[in-house]
């Protein structure tokens, strides 16, 4: 069964590929394989809206089942920022390091610098080319470190320390992060839907013989 990972980010692609390979035989490809593809601009207010927006566009473009996700980092002391601006906090053309730098600058301006609680919200969606949508949500609570730590991961990983851990996401081995992150939790919740779609695909194949 052919399935697209609607991302060109190496870390996300590796994580999702590893998840799919545990579930069955898939012909997996991603947006890395299509460098000229132009994804839609993310205009959603929530991770669910963005995941569905990205997934529907890709599924209809490539005419196959698609997995898409979106995450937002929310810091209550900053009024919910970066929130829907998580991917563009320091500007549309800024990179991950720029976003982290701006976040730390904002944290230093707080009257109460002790309150560094934060959480990630994530939605992962499985979408057919005909608009059938399955979705799963997950979140991860933690705190924002005072400085960047670690060299793996991406985005805000060098700043986010999950509750019950002392390391930032970027300091955790990739195999561990792929078990405890918000995206990993959402993928686990999505698993029954992926298995059902695969089973139906295999059944349809047998009936056509």
From Swiss-Prot:
<comment type="function">
    <text>Pyrophosphatase that catalyzes the hydrolysis of nucleoside triphosphates to their monophosphate derivatives, with a high preference for the non-canonical purine nucleotides XTP (xanthosine triphosphate), dITP (deoxyinosine triphosphate) and ITP. Seems to function as a house-cleaning enzyme that removes non-canonical purine nucleotides from the nucleotide pool, thus preventing their incorporation into DNA/RNA and avoiding chromosomal lesions.</text>
</comment>
<feature type="binding site">
    <location>
        <position position="70"/>
    </location>
    <ligand>
        <name>Mg(2+)</name>
    </ligand>
</feature>
<keyword id="KW-0546">Nucleotide metabolism</keyword>
<comment type="similarity">
    <text>Belongs to the HAM1 NTPase family.</text>
</comment>
<keyword id="KW-0547">Nucleotide-binding</keyword>
<dbReference type="InterPro" id="IPR002637">
    <property type="entry name" value="RdgB/HAM1"/>
</dbReference>
<dbReference type="GO" id="GO:0000166">
    <property type="term" value="F:nucleotide binding"/>
</dbReference>
<dbReference type="GO" id="GO:0036220">
    <property type="term" value="F:ITP diphosphatase activity"/>
</dbReference>
<dbReference type="GO" id="GO:0036222">
    <property type="term" value="F:XTP diphosphatase activity"/>
</dbReference>
<dbReference type="Pfam" id="PF01725">
    <property type="entry name" value="Ham1p_like"/>
</dbReference>
<feature type="binding site">
    <location>
        <begin position="154"/>
        <end position="157"/>
    </location>
    <ligand>
        <name>substrate</name>
    </ligand>
</feature>
<dbReference type="InterPro" id="IPR020922">
    <property type="entry name" value="dITP/XTP_pyrophosphatase"/>
</dbReference>
<feature type="active site" description="Proton acceptor">
    <location>
        <position position="70"/>
    </location>
</feature>
<dbReference type="GO" id="GO:0009117">
    <property type="term" value="P:nucleotide metabolic process"/>
</dbReference>
<keyword id="KW-0479">Metal-binding</keyword>
<dbReference type="InterPro" id="IPR029001">
    <property type="entry name" value="ITPase-like_fam"/>
</dbReference>
<keyword id="KW-0378">Hydrolase</keyword>
<protein>
    <recommendedName>
        <fullName>dITP/XTP pyrophosphatase</fullName>
        <ecNumber>3.6.1.66</ecNumber>
    </recommendedName>
</protein>
<feature type="binding site">
    <location>
        <position position="177"/>
    </location>
    <ligand>
        <name>substrate</name>
    </ligand>
</feature>
<dbReference type="GO" id="GO:0017111">
    <property type="term" value="F:ribonucleoside triphosphate phosphatase activity"/>
</dbReference>
<dbReference type="GO" id="GO:0035870">
    <property type="term" value="F:dITP diphosphatase activity"/>
</dbReference>
<feature type="binding site">
    <location>
        <begin position="7"/>
        <end position="12"/>
    </location>
    <ligand>
        <name>substrate</name>
    </ligand>
</feature>
<feature type="binding site">
    <location>
        <position position="71"/>
    </location>
    <ligand>
        <name>substrate</name>
    </ligand>
</feature>
<dbReference type="GO" id="GO:0009146">
    <property type="term" value="P:purine nucleoside triphosphate catabolic process"/>
</dbReference>
<comment type="subunit">
    <text>Homodimer.</text>
</comment>
<dbReference type="GO" id="GO:0046872">
    <property type="term" value="F:metal ion binding"/>
</dbReference>
<keyword id="KW-0460">Magnesium</keyword>
<dbReference type="GO" id="GO:0005829">
    <property type="term" value="C:cytosol"/>
</dbReference>
<feature type="binding site">
    <location>
        <begin position="182"/>
        <end position="183"/>
    </location>
    <ligand>
        <name>substrate</name>
    </ligand>
</feature>
